[in-house]
Amino acid sequence: MQEIEYSFSPEIAEADRPVVLESRIYREWLEASQKKFVVTKVHFSSVDFLRKGRQPLFIKLTATATLPDGRPVHGIVLVRGNAVGILVVLRCEGQKYLLLVRQPRFAIGEQASLEIPAGILDWTGDYRKVALSELKEEAQIDAEESELIDLMDFWYQGKSDGFAASCGLLDERIRLYAIERDVTPEQLRAMDGKDQQYTEEIEWIRTEVLPYEEAARQFVDGKNLIALFLYERWQQSRK
């Protein structure tokens, strides 16, 4: 394996540098990259840490890398690791609804971005466990693992952990699931408009229940649309 020459921008503290190099998200990115590319240098431009635990959340780096035949490739990467997303489909009196969340998304200038419940993969690497945790945390739903419909396994037949969110910059792959629930009108109303505040993570979340088609036409978040597409293909495959 090619030895890598490392460098760090001055703003990354000396004490944090070993933490970055040993972080799960960096090691997993590097391992995957070295299977297909020759990496000779990595310069770390900046690192954002989790507010609790001092683990890297985002790692901005520039690598010097080539294809095996020596052709150079663009090496700017924002490393953040993988994530999960869950499409929650509710059936009530013959109609379908989606249980979604709204939250501020500063990067796209949205105070209340409409999204499926989602979250980053934690140190366990257990996608299903994280999916169930996010359903509870964001959507206030207690679900069993047996309820999860693995849309990635259905579509990729075990060949990929998820779809690439922004393959020109991010290493992130998002694994998508769906769950289906039959609910009463009272339960449907109770799921709408629930507020969650997680000040340590700077998250302000409100649930929103919308008719299936109405919700779909409001989506601008890519993972929402892909989850919807895969769910509908999964449904078609069962007919």
Show where each model-derived region lies.
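N-terminal leader/linker segments that precede catalytic domains of diphosphate-processing enzymes
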Residues: M1-E115, I120-S133, I141-K239
